[in-house]
Each structure stands twice: as C-alpha cells, then as structure tokens.
Amino acid sequence: MTISDKIKSSINSYISRNHIDRLDIKAALIDMDGVLYDSMKYHTLAWHKMMSEVGIECSREEFYLYEGMTGKATINLLFQRKYGRIAGEEEWRKLYEKKAEYFVEIGKKEVMPGANAMLQNLIDCGIDRVLVTGSAQNSLIKYIDSDFPGAFEPQKRITALDVTKGKPDPEPYLKGLEKAGVCHTNAIVIENAPLGAQAGHAAGCFTIGITTGHFLSLTYIMPEQTLFSTLCKVLPTIYTSF
C-alpha cells in the first residue's frame, strides 16, 4: 500500500467514525517543539542536567517520552517516582526556571526542515493556523513571528500557561479549536510526540504524526494517524486525497 493509499484509508476511516461526508479542513493546530523547531535534543539535555543536579536519577532519553507535557507535570512525574509526592509550587517553579536557563545555554534555534513550506501551504490554501505547544519557554516562542512571519496570529497561540492540563489531555487542542472557531471535524492536528498525538486524537481531530520524534512509531498513534517522513509531504498529499 502506497503512502497515498494509506492516507486515503485513514481519511475514510475518520469520516466513517465521525459520520461526516468529507474531511473539510478549515484549521490546523500545530505543535512547536519537534514540528517547527528541531529543539527536543536540547530540551532533553536541559532536563537531564537539571534533574541530575538535584539528585533525581533519570535518563536523557526518557524526556522524549514526556514531550508535550507541561514543565510542572514533568517535574511532578519525577517527584512522584523519587519522593512519592508532587512538587510544591515554589519547588517546581524554581526547578523549571533552572531547566529553562540550561535550555538557553545549551540550545540552538534550529528551524525544522520543511516547516516553512508546510506553513506556506496552509496559508496558500486558506487554512487557519493555531500554535499549540506544551512549552512555556519564551526563548523559542518569541521567535515565532520572525521565523514564521504571518503564520500565527498572536491571539491564536496556546502555551503551557493557557492550560491546567497538558498533553496527553485534550485540553490544549480543545482550546486550540476554540481559538480557531471550528469543530473537531474541521481541524487537523500536526504533531511529532506520542503524548501530543494522543491529545489530538482525544480532542477528536484528524491527527497527523510526523517522524521527527525520537521514539515516535506506529505503536504510539491511533489508526487514523498516518506517519510522514518529512513535513513537506504532509499537506499536498492530504489535499489530493479528498
């Protein structure tokens, strides 16, 4: 089965389950780390450095699996494992600030190959764009306008500061749907992280998983979610499948 056939099959399955006539895309809800920026390798280094310094045993690789969670949720996950409790408000804020500092020190701002082409394709087709990120780090978010000019209106951005529950909870993408003013069957989610793909699916959206994630594989995504090797191939293939 070709990629095109797999996409058509996924779309038909989604249409059937949602009892709609066609997949009429009006908005795209787009993750940031791992989709727009090749930044997860730096996030994992920063998380591992910070946690190791405070005596919490962990591996760098495990933070790829937490991609999409809020910083608070990630810290609480490791606190539960180490201490059997969640972190206090002051504790997690200080730890997250330290992690953010390390990310700035370690990280480089690298736009993901194909990201601009994907966004331009959306713009050309009149598809609304909403940024939905589990990050609260302004070190990358502040560059969105300069790196992707005109792609995201300021009022159409969801960050960790806008939600009470991060991915894999659907709240971030449900809020993204509100920002776009569309229902779930009129939006696609573009993700690279297992937890983000779960969140998009839970929000009821047709969710596209792209293979930039360190651990992303078919075992992590739902039946209608099709993997793509590059961002550039995503939208043209889908548009010709309706």
Question: Each predicted region: which residue ranges?
Answer:
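Active-site neighborhood of HAD-like aspartate-dependent phosphohydrolases
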Residues: 3-62
